[in-house]
Curated annotation (Swiss-Prot):
Pfam families given in the database record: Peptidase_M17, Peptidase_M17_N
Compartment annotation: Cytoplasm
Chain sites annotated for binding Zn(2+) 3: L202, M203, T205, R303
Keywords noted in UniProt: Acetylation, Aminopeptidase, Cytoplasm, Hydrolase, Magnesium, Manganese, Metal-binding, Phosphoprotein, Protease, Zinc
Modified-residue entries (N6-succinyllysine), positions: K45, K61, K103, K221, K455, K476, K489
Gene: LAP3
Record InterPro entries: Leucine_aapep/pepB, Macro_dom-like, Peptidase_M17_C, Peptidase_M17_leu_NH2_pept, Peptidase_M17_N
Complex formation: Homohexamer.
Chain positions with Phosphoserine modification: S42, S54, S180, S194, S238
Protein name: Cytosol aminopeptidase
Length: 519
C-alpha cells in the first residue's frame, strides 16, 4: 500500500503497518469498481483530535480503527477542501478518500452571505469525487457529511466536465449516498446540480452546434421528459413578425440562422387559472458584436451569451422534475448577433413591441434589444412575478466579478426572496441600483424614445437595467445580470473551469421556497 501525498518520515511507519496488514498492497490488487468519500472536521482546539463524521466513525470502526491510525501518520490534519487517499482498507472499496470539511457546525456567514457549512461540504465532496474519477473508478459512495443535499450537489457539480467532442473522455463516475441516510435530500441535491449542469452544457456547446433551433429542441426534449404538465412552443420568424417584435428582429436579421422565440410552460398548480411566474432569458447563441464588432480575444466565450436563456430554461426543467405546485412560463428570444449587409447599423432606429422607438447606437448592446420585446410579451400572462436573466454587460463583470449575480429590482419583497435563496445555495446575488439617475441617461435620446446605450461610459450595468425598465410595468420584476458569473476559472472550487451555469440553483431554490410559501 502507498499513500499520496506522504511525508518521508511516515514511509517507514507505512511499511511497518503494511507488514501488520493494516491495509493491502495497493489499488491494483483491490476491486477497482467503487470508491468511498468520507468527511472529517477540523480540530476545534489545538489538543483535540480531528472528528470524523458519523459515516466516517462507522467506517473507522468497521476497519478496526485503521483509518484514523493511517490518517494520523500520513500528514497534518486536513484543511477544508483538502483530500487524502487510502487504498485497500476494505474489500468493498478500492480507494477511500478522506476530505476536510472545516469547522463542525459552521452556519450562515453574514459577511460572506452564504452558509459556510454547506459550501464546505460542496467543495470537499467535489474534491473527493474528482480523486476517484482520476483513479478511473466508475462508482463512488459519498458520505452525506451532515447535509445530503449539499453533498449531492458537490458530487454532481464537481464531476461534470464538457468533453463530448473529445475522443478521450473522462471516466463517467456514478455517485450515490453512502449508508441509509436522507435519500430524499440526496435526490433533491442531484436534481439541483443536474439543472445547473444542463445550463453548463447549453452554454459550453460550440455555437455552430447550439444554434437557436437546436437550443429550443434540447429544451423541448428535457422539459417533455421532466413532466407531462408541460407545453413547448417553438415560435418561428413569422410569429415574431406577427407579434411586432421589431427590436428582436433587428438583431436577428444580421445572421443566416433563423431566429426562434422559445415559449415553455409548466402547469404544476392544481388551479389552472393560477397566474404564472414568468422567466425571461437572453438567448444570443453567438455574439460577435454585430457591426460594432468585438475584439477577437475571447470572442469564443460568446457562445455562452445565451446563458440567461440556459439558466431560466434549466430552472423550469428542474421545477418540473420537482413537481412544484406552481405555474411557470419561460420565454427565450433566440438568435445570433452577426455583422452582414442586413445587420443593424449604429444610428438605426427600431420599434419595440410596446411601440417605443429605440436608437441603436451600439450593435453590441443587443441583449437588451431582444429582451425588450420578450419583457413586453411577458406581461400578457398576467404574471405574479417577472424575472429576467442575461449575460448583459461587461460592466457587471467589472463591478462584481464572479462573486455574485447583480440583481436590479423594483420590489424589495422579490429581492429578499432571491437573497435568502442564494444564501442557501451559495450562488450569491447582490442588489444593484435602479435609480432615475440612470434612466435619464438613456431617455435623453436624439432620434428615438430611448437609446440602447447610456450617455456616459460609467455605470454600464445600471444604464442597461434602466433601459429594460422602460419595457416593464409589473411591480414585481427583477433583472439578473449574470455576465460576471458566466464562467468559472478557479473561483468556485466545486465547478471545473468553463461555463458556470450560474445562478440556476438559486432560481430553483427561490421557486421551491415560493411554492412552499404559497401552499
Amino acid at each position: 500500500m502507498f499513500l499520496l501525498p506522504l511525508p518521508a518520515a511516515a514511509r517507514v511507519a507505512v511499511r511497518q503497518l503494511s507488514v501488520r496488514r493494516f491495509w493491502g498492497p495497493g489499488p491494483d490488487a483491490a476491486n477497482m469498481t467503487k470508491g468511498l468519500v468520507l468527511g472529517i472536521y477540523s480540530k476545534e482546539k489545538e489538543d483535540d483530535a480531528p472528528q470524523f463524521t458519523s459515516a466516517g466513525e462507522n467506517f473507522d470502526k468497521l476497519v478496526s480503527g485503521k483509518l484514523r491510525e493511517i490518517l494520523n501518520i500520513s500528514g497534518p490534519p486536513l484543511k477544508a477542501g483538502k483530500t487524502r487517499t487510502f487504498y485497500g482498507l476494505h474489500e468493498d472499496f478500492s480507494s477511500v478518500v478522506v476530505v476536510g470539511l472545516g469547522k463542525k457546525g459552521a452556519g450562515v456567514d453574514d459577511q460572506e452571505n452564504w452558509h459556510e457549512g454547506k459550501e464546505n461540504i460542496r467543495a470537499a465532496v467535489a474534491a473527493g469525487c474528482r480523486q476517484i474519477q482520476d483513479l478511473e473508478i466508475p462508482s463512488v459512495e459519498v458520505d452525506p457529511c451532515g447535509d445530503a443535499q449539499a453533498a449531492a450537489e458537490g458530487a454532481v457539480l464537481g464531476l461534470y466536465e464538457y468533453d463530448e467532442l473529445k475522443q478521450k473522455k473522462k471516466v463517467v463516475v456514478s455517485a450515490k449516498l453512502h449508508g441509509s441516510g436522507d435519500q430524499e435530500a440526496w435526490q433533491r441535491g442531484v436534481l439541483f446540480a443536474s439543472g445547473q449542469n444542463l445550463a453548463r452544457h447549453l452554454m459550453e456547446t460550440p455555437a455552430n452546434e447550439m444554434t437557436p433551433t437546436r437550443f429550443a429542441e434540447v429544451i423541448e426534449k428535457n422539459l417533455k421528459s421532466a413532466s407531462s404538465k408541460t407545453d413547448v412552443h417553438i415560435r418561428p420568424k413569422s410569429w415574431i413578425e406577427e407579434q411586432e417584435m421589431g427590436s428582436f428582429l433587428s438583431v436577428a436579421k444580421g445572421s443566416e440562422e433563423p431566429p426562434v422565440f422559445l415559449e415553455i410552460h409548466y402547469k404544476g398548480s392544481p388551479d389552472a387559472s393560477d397566474p404564472p411566474l414568468v422567466f425571461v432569458g437572453k438567448g444570443i447563441t453567438f455574439d460577435s458584436g454585430g457591426i460594432s464588432i468585438k475584439a477577437s480575444a475571447n470572442m469564443d466565450l460568446m457562445r455562452a451569451d445565451m446563458g440567461g436563456a440556459a439558466t431560466i430554461c434549466s430552472t423550469i426543467v428542474s421545477a418540473a422534475k420537482l413537481d412544484l405546485p406552481i405555474n411557470l412560463v419561460g420565454l427565450a428570444p433566440l438568435c445570433e448577433n452577426m455583422p452582414s449587409g442586413k445587420a443593424n447599423k449604429p444610428g438605426d432606429v427600431v420599434r419595440a413591441k410596446n411601440g417605443k422607438t429605440i436608437q441603436v447606437d451600439n450593435t453590441d448592446a443587443e441583449g437588451r434589444l431582444i429582451l425588450a420585446d420578450a419583457l413586453c410579451y411577458a406581461h400578457t400572462f398576467n404574471p405574479k412575478v417577472i424575472i429576467n436573466a442575461a449575460t448583459l454587460t461587461g460592466a457587471m463583470d467589472i463591478a462584481l466579478g464572479s462573486g455574485a449575480t447583480g440583481v436590479f429590482t423594483n420590489s424589495s419583497w422579490l429581492w429578499n426572496k432571491l437573497f435568502e435563496a442564494s444564501i442557501e445555495t451559495g450562488d450569491r446575488v447582490w442588489r444593484m441600483p435602479l435609480f432615475e439617475h440612470y434612466t435619464k441617461q438613456i431617455v435623453d435620446c436624439q432620434l428615438a424614445d430611448v437609446n440602447n446605450i447610456g450617455k456616459y461610459r460609467s455605470a454600464g450595468a445600471c444604464t442597461a437595467a434602466a433601459f429594460l425598465k422602460e419595457f416593464v410595468t409589473h411591480p414585481k420584476w427583477a433583472h439578473l445580470d449574470i455576465a460576471g458569473v458566466m464562467t468559472n476559472k478557479d473561483e468556485v472550487p466545486y465547478l471545473r473551469k468553463g461555463m458556470a451555469g450560474r445562478p440556476t440553483r438559486t432560481l430553483i431554490e427561490f421557486l421551491l421556497r415560493f411554492s412552499q410559501d404559497s401552499a
